Amino acid sequence: MQGLAPPTSVSIHRHLPARSRARASNSVRFSPRAVSSVPPAECLQAPFHKPVADLPAPSRKPAAIAVPGHAAAPRKAEGGKKQLNLFQRAAAAALDAFEEGFVANVLERPHGLPSTADPAVQIAGNFAPVGERPPVHELPVSGRIPPFIDGVYARNGANPCFDPVAGHHLFDGDGMVHALRIRNGAAESYACRFTETARLRQERAIGRPVFPKAIGELHGHSGIARLALFYARAACGLVDPSAGTGVANAGLVYFNGRLLAMSEDDLPYHVRVADDGDLETVGRYDFDGQLGCAMIAHPKLDPATGELHALSYDVIKRPYLKYFYFRPDGTKSDDVEIPLEQPTMIHDFAITENLVVVPDHQVVFKLQEMLRGGSPVVLDKEKTSRFGVLPKHAADASEMAWVDVPDCFCFHLWNAWEDEATGEVVVIGSCMTPADSIFNESDERLESVLTEIRLDARTGRSTRRAVLPPSQQVNLEVGMVNRNLLGRETRYAYLAVAEPWPKVSGFAKVDLSTGELTKFEYGEGRFGGEPCFVPMDPAAAHPRGEDDGYVLTFVHDERAGTSELLVVNAADMRLEATVQLPSRVPFGFHGTFITGQELEAQAA
């Protein structure tokens, strides 16, 4: 990760070997002022930014602390301390001693952490977690919120509940949803709550983190040891992985009366927005027993049919990839098993009016690399990247057409459509290089280039072009198009300006046909996240103008230590209103807007 703040004379990488320290210090720098500007009421009870040798012994104390003066609402699902029999108490003590004496002291502490697994890097400044916040009402507003905006802006993100005891990647944190209710031109309420996953409930009952962190911990021999330790605890009945191991921290989608919080390592979780603006986790959601596998965090809701299209990938056993969809009433299609030679990281995909577009890129899973001391997430340079084009209602994968797109890795795809004039499928995504830099340390500068990719399924040929001219090239990541036009040709995309990486200094409106770029910049020392486009008429299949709507986004002021919600006119990119939030909102991942009608139609 590159320069997050002006250089300082204090290195946070003192514990790393000299070579790693030099690399990390050149690529990640933090300002003490930015960290100390966090309001003291929200600071963690234990220091978070420690060398691995100084990381705490297994913590009995959650990292996320409620804000004084605002008592946290009771958690119905918490269930208290886990009751253990004599054998389990002995096994727990022995396994804890093995973790501290061998895994931590022998396998981990003699080695430095890469920046991609260093808590001092991954959860510093406004990436650090916050405590839960019960609803706060009647928030101050500057400017005018358009009265048509009626609903809840909800945004997901990673917010570790416990202090890390080993490596930690930003993607490893527990899911927390931040929700802002807007109605009649007023900001009625704000709340943030953990999504009460089975993983989080079990760790709270035990009083410490025990589930493996997929990116931060599972590398090398120590990763194998931590996996073995986890399954030993499961064999002793100390944890139950069958109840779910995911963190539900990435995506949000509203479908069939339910707001679903998702990460690709588990089933979705149903989160309900209460009448007072609070958030309640209903539970792990398997679509009434129809879904028995994990689902990626970016399912696609077709605005015309109401169908929800999804993928599921498996890193251990075949089939490594499956496609399925849900009809508007929630009934599930049969799985289409897509044959892949090796398990592949597929974080996102795209739909058109009639097709599903599936990336098969070079970032793959090779668990055997852990035996060699490496990460199981690997850039396979011998593999040729490709996209698969499959009819939405295909009976099996025999209808899939593959098109090679060499050296292309799109972590996110913003839209796709069918070009009737050429017969090609047009895909809009951000091509990232180095492809594995999010997961593995790299000396190269990360670039995320907004790209138009054209796939000709008849000939197997592809072309690609950068949407922006070289003189205007900026890193564009996380964002969306008008959701009423998803899968159809769109002119505009609203994307975060991810500079200086990994912070977001503003967002851009991009004309996908001309490359014209219009930026909305947050200002010095102010950073945000994903822009959420809210169309003027949420149900309009053909709006008056594609950009007829507003953009909502959270922004944090590092100097003042305050956070806000901005409301920006999507057509002219002018600020309409600012909502002052009662507490800090960390940088997060993806969000959605739930309309007032959808709130009223929520399932119990």
Swiss-Prot record:
An example molecular function term from Gene Ontology annotations: carotenoid dioxygenase activity
Transit peptide residue numbers: 1-23
Residues annotated for Fe cation binding in this entry: H298, H347, H412, H590
Top-level taxon in the UniProt lineage: Eukaryota
Catalytic class of the enzyme: oxidoreductase
Pfam family membership, one: RPE65
Assigned keywords, A-Z: Abscisic acid biosynthesis, Chloroplast, Dioxygenase, Iron, Metal-binding, Oxidoreductase, Plastid, Stress response, Transit peptide
InterPro entries: Carotenoid_Oase (IPR004294)
Biased composition, class Basic residues, residue ranges: 12-22
Region (Disordered) residue spans: 1-27
Catalytic activity as recorded in UniProt: a 9-cis-epoxycarotenoid + O2 = a 12'-apo-carotenal + 2-cis,4-trans-xanthoxin; 9-cis-violaxanthin + O2 = (3S,5R,6S)-5,6-epoxy-3-hydroxy-5,6-dihydro-12'-apo-beta-caroten-12'-al + 2-cis,4-trans-xanthoxin; 9'-cis-neoxanthin + O2 = (3S,5R,6R)-3,5-dihydroxy-6,7-didehydro-5,6-dihydro-12'-apo-beta-caroten-12'-al + 2-cis,4-trans-xanthoxin
Tissue: Expressed in leaves, roots and embryos.
Induction: By drought stress.
Family: Belongs to the carotenoid oxygenase family.
Function: Has a 11,12(11',12') 9-cis epoxycarotenoid cleavage activity. Catalyzes the first step of abscisic-acid biosynthesis from carotenoids. Not active on the all-trans isomers of violaxanthin and neoxanthin. Contributes probably to abscisic acid synthesis for the induction of seed dormancy.
Protein name, entry field: 9-cis-epoxycarotenoid dioxygenase 1, chloroplastic
Protein source organism: Zea mays (Maize)
Taxon lineage: Eukaryota, Viridiplantae, Streptophyta, Embryophyta, Tracheophyta
